[in-house]
């Protein structure tokens, strides 16, 4: 297995694999030290009015507030094209199939939609997954000081921004949880959060200036 991680986040019209649609997918590849490789990719796919009108109110409000619904309506990208765009980016940094684990937050849900709609992408990834949410849950039980000191989550509910948050969160756990006991003090945890937050602000500015086109 290689050291790269493939981070993916998806936005859907809901969580029902039987009826809901995949409408946005973003991907970033990192090395073993969680350094981001390349610019990443963020693709919004078209969905028809029937799919969008079937969203429950909370999801419809979330995607309206983020601007995603308008982008979905305007998009001409289908699932096959989006899958090819994501694979083109990943192939720049991961040369061998089935070597790079999928990483993200609550990633099993995303992978289920990927397996349904983008089987070539799914089969390219290693079967193992790195779910940052699992580390969060373990910290809540074993290291509450770290859990309650974690960086605040954003509320953009957009795929690329969510990946950046997930990477930042794993960087946080690497520096606070994956260390010899007794671990960092409360003030040391706060210092890590402040440093990571400063970096996140700079990254958001870069994303805004150089966001990949959706097609």
UniProtKB/Swiss-Prot annotation:
It is found in: Cytoplasm. GO terms for molecular function: 3'-5'-RNA exonuclease activity; nucleic acid binding. SUPFAM superfamilies: Ribonuclease H-like (SSF53098). It is an enzyme of class 3 (hydrolase). Its main location: cytoplasm. The active site is at 127. The keyword Cell cycle does not apply. Its EC number is 3.1.15.-. Residues 5-170 form the Exonuclease domain. Residues 196-215 are annotated as: Disordered. Belongs to the oligoribonuclease family. PANTHER family: OLIGORIBONUCLEASE, MITOCHONDRIAL. HAMAP family: Oligoribonuclease. This is Oligoribonuclease. The lineage of its organism: Bacteria, Bacillati, Actinomycetota, Actinomycetes, Mycobacteriales. The gene is orn.
């Amino acid at each position: 297995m290689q050291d790269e991680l493939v981070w993916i986040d998806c936005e859907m019209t809901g969580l029902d694999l039987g009826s809901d649609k995949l409408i946005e997918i973003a991907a970033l590849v990192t090395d073993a030290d969680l350094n981001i490789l390349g610019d990443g990719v963020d693709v919004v796919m078209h969905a028809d009015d029937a799919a969008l009108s079937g969203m429950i109110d909370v999801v419809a409000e979330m995607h309206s507030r983020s601007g995603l619904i308008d982008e979905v309506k305007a998009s001409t990208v289908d699932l096959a094209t989006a899958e090819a765009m994501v694979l083109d980016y990943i192939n720049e940094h991961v040369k061998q199939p089935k070597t790079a684990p999928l990483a993200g937050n609550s990633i099993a849900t995303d992978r289920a939609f990927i397996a349904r709609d983008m089987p070539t992408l799914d089969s390219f990834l290693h079967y193992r997954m790195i779910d940052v949410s699992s580390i969060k849950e373990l910290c809540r039980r074993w290291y509450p000081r770290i859990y309650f000191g974690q960086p605040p989550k954003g509320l953009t509910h957009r795929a690329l921004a969510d990946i950046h948050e997930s990477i930042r969160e794993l960087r946080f756990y690497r520096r606070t949880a994956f260390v010899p006991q007794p671990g960092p003090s409360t003030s040391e945890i706060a210092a890590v959060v402040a440093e990571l937050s400063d970096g996140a602000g700079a990254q958001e500015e870069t994303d805004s200036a150089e966001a990949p086109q959706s097609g």
